[in-house]
């Protein structure tokens, strides 16, 4: 009988620890509210939402009239509204080019793209004009603009205060 009591106590303790630590593990390291525009020939979204940065993933949630219209997760794979693919497949389908895998995460994180090619510092951030790819990328304080004229792709992120 005492073994059953001990097992029961361990089970309860394990369940509590799993529940508590499980919820704790998914807390974002950083969250920001944004106006997010993602305009491509295959997808057109421009609404308000959130960017959540976790240890091993980035998540973008965009809402329209209180309903989730875009749930984009960047981790080992990239998932859009629950449908996952590898980065190259996503880049070809939505960015219409075989960019390197981390380009979308770099844009969201305000990091220079293409190893800082043609990087020009500005008074509020930096800009890059990559002529051979017809890309203009600009980071200025709380505004990020990625415009790929060749492939008709625009990503604009304005962080809200």
Segments (PLM) and residue ranges:
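C-terminal motif of bacterial Sec signal peptides marking the signal peptidase cleavage site
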Residues: 19-22
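Post-signal-peptide N-terminal segment of Sec-exported extracytoplasmic proteins
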Residues: 31-32, 39-73
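An acidic-aromatic
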Residues: 56-102
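Mature, soluble, non-transmembrane domains
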Residues: 82, 91-161
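Bacterial signal peptide processing site
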Residues: 24-26
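Terminal targeting/leader modules
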Residues: 28-40, 145-147, 153
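Beta-strand-dominated lipid-handling architectures at cellular/organellar boundaries
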Residues: 29, 52-54, 76-79, 152-161
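Bacterial N-terminal signal peptides that target proteins for export
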Residues: 1-12
């Amino acid at each position: 009988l005492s073994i059953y009591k001990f097992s029961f106590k361990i089970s309860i303790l394990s369940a509590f620890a799993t529940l508590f630590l499980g919820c704790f593990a998914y807390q974002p390291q950083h969250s920001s509210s944004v106006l997010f525009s993602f305009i491509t020939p295959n997808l057109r979204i421009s609404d308000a939402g959130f960017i959540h940065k976790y240890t091993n993933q980035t998540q973008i949630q965009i809402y329209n009239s209180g309903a989730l219209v875009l749930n984009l997760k960047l981790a080992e794979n990239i998932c859009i509204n629950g449908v996952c693919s590898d980065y190259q497949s996503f880049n070809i389908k939505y960015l219409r080019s075989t960019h390197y895998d981390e380009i979308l995460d770099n844009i969201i994180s305000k990091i220079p793209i293409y190893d800082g090619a043609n990087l020009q510092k500005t008074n509020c951030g930096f800009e890059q004009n990559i002529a051979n790819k017809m890309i203009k990328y600009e980071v200025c304080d709380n505004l990020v603009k990625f415009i790929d004229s060749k492939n008709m792709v625009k990503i604009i992120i304005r962080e809200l205060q």
